Amino acid sequence: MSHKAGFVNIIGNPNVGKSTLMNAMVGEKLSIITSKAQTTRHRIFGIVNDEEYQIVFSDTPGIIKPAYDLQTSMMDFVKSAFSDADILIYMVEIGEKELKDEEFFNKIIHAKIPVLLLLNKIDKSNQELLEEQVQTWQAKVPNAEIFPISALENFNVKEVLNRIVDLLPLSPPYYPKDALTDKPERFFVNETIREKILLNYDKEIPYAVEVETEEFLEDEKIIRIRSVIMVERDTQKGIIIGHKGAALKKVGMQARADLELFFDKQIHIEIFVKVNKDWRNNAFQLRRFGYNQK
């Protein structure tokens, strides 16, 4: 058997470009992207297929100190990424210090599997700073191969992909060869709506929100979607809806445009807002939304 396959798990601090990298590798927007921390909440697989190999990339939440139960569940996803990886990608950006979480950083420097340290956002750097950063990270993570990249500009991404293929273990594919991800359609509807909330609202509002798609009906030409935005308090519900529903309408229009590109079909979407009190600290609700796996 000459076929290769393996899990390549991407970890790092918030906003270092993990989701941008996976989307670039896969060639599809599977992970939502905003400038806000904690945009990625779940562990999302993106699958790259070739006749001779299959790479299962795993995007993970940025590493933080949990402040409530939802964030604890998010960090559990990161822990699971250490346990099943064949190759670990530790992603940092120019000027960044190592992970604040000592436990996770120790797991990286003592990993028994290949570690690729990707020094991202080099388009915002100069040659002198870049060389200094490479030396700094070589000293901090001596077990890692270092690749300066720009995930946004797609610089050096192909070289990283080639190195991953070199390092993959011999294995049959883990997923069908036409698979792109492990997530269902409704997950991407939920995430697209949540991305628009992250982009259109400030302060605590985006972090108090969860999205659930109650209806996804697809026929030959159109997909009919009914989704619900969950918030924790009535005041948040009013802010999400906005004056005469204008803010919610804007979210719906933006989400529909993205979903029509993603599914390549006409989309009819209805979005409602409900209060789900303190869902971020409710074990039952976290399980319902796919966070608490315990």
Language-model features: locations:
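Conserved G1/Walker A P-loop phosphate-binding module
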Residues: 1-76, 80-82
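Conserved glycine(s) of the Walker
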Residues: 17, 156, 247
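Active-site phosphate-binding and catalytic loops of NTP-dependent enzymes
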Residues: 31-33, 100, 172-176, 199-211
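Catalytic P-loop NTPase motifs of RecA-like helicase/translocase cores
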Residues: 40, 63-65, 97-98, 125-126, ...
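Conserved C-terminal guanine-recognition region of P-loop GTPase G domains, centered on the G4
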Residues: 52, 76-144, 217-219
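Active-site glycine-centered loops adjacent to acidic/histidine catalytic or metal-binding residues
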Residues: 59, 120, 150
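Canonical P-loop GTPase G-domain recognition
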Residues: 114, 123-181
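P-loop NTP-binding site
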Residues: 185-294
